Amino acid sequence: MDYLPLFADLKQRPVLIVGGGEVAARKIELLHRAGAQVWVVAQTLSSELEQQYQDGRIHWLAQDFLPEQLDNVFLVIAATNDTVLNAAVFAAADQRCILANVVDDQPLCSFIFPSIVDRSPLVVAISSSGQAPVLARILREKLEALLPTRLSDMAAIAGRWRGRVKQHMASMGERRRFWEHAFSGRFASLISRGQLTEAENELQLSLEGQHRALGEVALVGAGPGDAGLLTLRGLQVMQQADVVLYDHLVSPEVLDLVRRDAERICVGKRAGAHSVTQEATNQLLVTLAQQGKRVVRLKGGDPFIFGRGGEELQVVAQAGIPFQVVPGVTAAAGATAYAGIPLTHRDHAQSVTFITGHCRPDGDDLDWQALARGRQTLAIYMGTVKAAAISQQLIAHGRSSTTPVAVIGRGTRVDQQVLIGTLAQLESLAQQAPTPALLVIGEVVNLHHQIAWFGQQPQTESAINPSVVNLA
């Protein structure tokens, strides 16, 4: 190792900063977070530091640097653009065996600042030993995405409970197993949902040997296909799953992000070929959770938009199973954005309506009169099979047969296809589109030719012949 990683306790310790500009201000912000007592040596201060001085947050020595200013200082940072001054600060500190950092000048550093992921009291520090700071920053960003923000609560509660756990468990191995179970089980799940009191109750039950073998269900929206649209929260929950129930709308790229040793069960349904009934899926969620497993129900798009997620959670709730919901990017938002079709536009559409092509068998007919009105966008899910009836009803109720339409197949994926035509051609377009497909009806479709951005540039065809844009 070029550097030994250390965590320094700076609370109320004097730290000297030489320099009063923006770079100094960035370092001072870190020092404040660590509770340091900051002294600044500079002839002038930036407006930000001037305000901190007025607020009493820093001490200011409005003079030139002198070596004796290092007396009784814990460490020093030189943050000026004067290389001679910076070298003098380092030399004086080195002579006194005081840790020194000259910003962006590694040879003049006896310590360096790492990239930091702050989940205090849990702190992760990453360093490239000054060789590749951009790489360290990229790794920090990846860890920021993977580490839940609630880790700070988890670490704080664990700190408060260490003494009690030690009193109950004399063996270090026993204590280690206790915390391993807590950090990967129901205690961690409760923390992630912000249920801190319940989480501490769970620790108490575990200490008393009353831990219930009860799992939980997480309803997670997988988004429309592109794995990059999966939410950070969704990724974190998927990485903790014991078993994942997924449907056919979940892309392989998203499934690849599931924890490697998690069991995967396909409960997908297709029109006319339901491989698993909804009732069987509902019961399976309950059964698996009652076995103490962390169950993820992974649904394409958003689970509460035509995904029957509400029905599934009603059954889970009635069984007394804990659950949580992680929203996802719904297909109408994701697919249209990737196709360059805004759902609303000041000049073309003041409203948007989401419609499902799969209606309840005993449901009322749609309000076609309202849907046929102009200056609105219709986004129809699972509507390819009924495209002919949709077109006929809208035209019969007053919508122009030349209204622009788009059928977006496999939206947001690398093989996305966008088919453009008119309302009269909707059935033909739907027959050509790969599934899953979204129907979009309204004048906003015309903007596709101007602002399509994903994959190849749009290919404009005549209004008579539908255009196909293959974005593979």
Curated annotation (Swiss-Prot):
It catalyses: uroporphyrinogen III + 2 S-adenosyl-L-methionine = precorrin-2 + 2 S-adenosyl-L-homocysteine + H(+); precorrin-2 + NAD(+) = sirohydrochlorin + NADH + 2 H(+); siroheme + 2 H(+) = sirohydrochlorin + Fe(2+). It comes from the Bacteria. The modification Phosphoserine is found at S128. InterPro entries: 4pyrrol_Mease, 4pyrrol_Methylase_sf, 4pyrrole_Mease_sub1, 4pyrrole_Mease_sub2, CobA/CysG_C, NAD(P)-bd_dom_sf, Siro_Cobalamin_biosynth, Sirohaem_synt_dimer_dom_sf. Keywords: Cobalamin biosynthesis, Lyase, Methyltransferase, Multifunctional enzyme, NAD, Oxidoreductase, Phosphoprotein, Porphyrin biosynthesis, S-adenosyl-L-methionine, Transferase. GO terms for biological process: cobalamin biosynthetic process; methylation; siroheme biosynthetic process. Transmembrane segments: none annotated. S-adenosyl-L-methionine binds at P224, G300, G301, D302, I305, T330, A331, M382, G411. The active site is at D247, K269. One of its GO terms (molecular function) is precorrin-2 dehydrogenase activity. SUPFAM superfamilies: NAD(P)-binding Rossmann-fold domains, Siroheme synthase middle domains-like, Tetrapyrrole methylase. Residues 215-472 are annotated as: Uroporphyrinogen-III C-methyltransferase. In the N-terminal section; belongs to the precorrin-2 dehydrogenase / sirohydrochlorin ferrochelatase family. In the C-terminal section; belongs to the precorrin methyltransferase family. Then it catalyzes the NAD-dependent ring dehydrogenation of precorrin-2 to yield sirohydrochlorin. Finally, it catalyzes the ferrochelation of sirohydrochlorin to yield siroheme. HAMAP family: Siroheme_synth. This is Siroheme synthase 1. The lineage of its organism: Bacteria, Pseudomonadati, Pseudomonadota, Gammaproteobacteria, Enterobacterales.
